[in-house]
Amino acid sequence: MEPPSRHAGTDIIIEDARWRASVPGTERAIRRALVAVARQGGPDFTQSPAPSILLATDRIVKRLNARFRDKNKPTNVLTFEPLSPMHGGDIVLGYETVRREAAAARRSLRAHLSHLVVHGALHLAGYDHHHPGEAREMEGIETRTLRSLGFGDPWRQGNWQQAGSVRI
């Protein structure tokens, strides 16, 4: 495991070196996504505690998913609510699943990572996608945020499936 990297108040822990090898400037991409989502109406982590980000393997995500959701399989992103007012929560991403989804959707790994960081940050801020109105609002913020970062609309490109993302 590499030491945490601090950007904009966010602890970024890269458990799997393939993240850095596949997404040059990984930490900067994450920081940019968090700043961009605030500009589009999402959570502003300069005003509240920022989340910790763990870039992990599917094996780690599978273990967490089994322990906290009783689902013995990996997923793309898990979010964990803050345990105290001084903590911003946690966003955990599984490398193999995220890479596979990006390839299937014909998107860069950087674009998909940015999308899932934004998605996780919105979950931590209380947004959800279980009802059509909530989903439209959340997807709208995600789309505006990703466009501001120079990426296309994640809901119109490729085969993106939100079903794998979960909030705990």
Curated annotation (Swiss-Prot):
GO terms for molecular function: metalloendopeptidase activity; RNA endonuclease activity; zinc ion binding. Zn(2+) binds at residues 119, 123, 129. The keyword Cell division does not apply. GO terms for cellular component: cytoplasm. It is found in: Cytoplasm. Single strand-specific metallo-endoribonuclease involved in late-stage 70S ribosome quality control and in maturation of the 3' terminus of the 16S rRNA. This is Endoribonuclease YbeY. The lineage of its organism: Bacteria, Pseudomonadati, Pseudomonadota, Alphaproteobacteria, Acetobacterales.
